């Protein structure tokens, strides 16, 4: 009798242990499920494009960065150097590659100035459109000139060129969503040659609007850039009849999606990025909507 009771007791203890084991396992799985749900409800914040580990805020303004490396920018030949030490700029994208007129490049500006960023990729506007605020970790990148235009990138053919896209993603952080009310997106209005002359070539790139000008070669037939040419220079006249001259021209790439559009006749406003080409100015419109008729 005692032996039977002892066996029964041991059997009951074994069953209880199994039940406790099952119960504990169930509680653990339930906890894991709750944790999983919590993680799902609280996704990782920050933009998926770029490097969210880059601290917000700049360590130097764009104008100060260009001045610091001016010996490698304002020179008679294309040169470059590597940016050393903690160096971050923060600004707003004022020109992207949406139309293809600015090819594999972006322009970033803060309240002090702007600079060209070379990236060896197309379709950058999908992630880095006009109005997107960015922080760029410049350490390890190269800064220099292309025809005296300040540019950040990496070395190509012994000059500063376009960085690979994976390098760009390591060095850029996107801040919030794109917005079009940043002051950097308000162009400087130019109505006379004197107002253009007041802008120093070292300030390029500059977002500008030429008011009430006429495209000299617009005849109702001529297009911005015929397909048999890589790019075309177009000239215009100011409202007072003054010619833009050889030191100022409208640049259009044959690869721009509006290159075969017929140039408008009459008075127009032309908004674009004023780039330096040695000691000349070239105006690069971002999209066809940057050229607006006045009549």
Model-found features: residue ranges?
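OB-fold nucleic-acid-binding modules
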Residues: 38-103, 107-133, 137-295
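C-terminal motif of bacterial Sec signal peptides marking the signal peptidase cleavage site
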Residues: 33-36
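Bacterial N-terminal signal peptides that target proteins for export
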Residues: 15-24
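Short, Lys/Arg-enriched N-terminal segments with co-localized hydrophobic residues
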Residues: 1-15
């Amino acid at each position: 009798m005692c032996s039977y009771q002892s066996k029964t007791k041991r059997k009951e203890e074994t069953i209880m242990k199994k039940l406790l084991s099952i119960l504990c396992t169930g509680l653990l799985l339930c906890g894991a499920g709750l944790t999983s749900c919590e993680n799902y409800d609280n996704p990782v914040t920050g933009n998926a494009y770029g490097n969210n580990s880059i601290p917000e805020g700049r360590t130097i303004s764009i104008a100060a960065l260009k001045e610091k490396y001016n010996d490698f920018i304002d020179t008679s030949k294309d040169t470059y150097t590597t940016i050393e030490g903690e160096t971050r700029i923060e600004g707003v994208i004022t020109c992207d590659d949406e139309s293809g007129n600015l090819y594999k490049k972006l322009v970033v500006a803060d309240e002090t100035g702007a600079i060209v960023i070379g990236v060896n990729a197309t379709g950058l506007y999908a992630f880095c459109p006009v109005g997107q605020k960015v922080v760029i970790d410049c350490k390890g990148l190269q800064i220099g000139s292309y025809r005296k235009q300040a540019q950040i990138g990496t070395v190509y053919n012994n000059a500063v060129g376009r960085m690979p896209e994976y390098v760009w993603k390591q060095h850029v952080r996107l801040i919030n969503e794109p917005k079009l009310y940043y002051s950097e997106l308000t162009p400087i209005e130019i109505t006379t040659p004197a107002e253009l002359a007041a802008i120093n070539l070292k300030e390029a790139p500059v977002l500008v609007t030429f008011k009430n000008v006429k495209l000299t070669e617009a005849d109702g037939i001529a297009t911005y850039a015929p397909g048999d040419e890589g790019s075309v220079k177009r000239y215009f006249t100011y409202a007072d009849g003054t010619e833009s001259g050889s030191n100022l021209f409208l640049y259009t790439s044959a690869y721009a999606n509006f290159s075969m559009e017929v140039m408008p006749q009459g008075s127009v406003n032309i908004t674009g990025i004023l780039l330096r080409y040695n000691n000349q100015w070239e105006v690069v419109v971002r999209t066809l909507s940057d050229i607006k008729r006045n009549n």
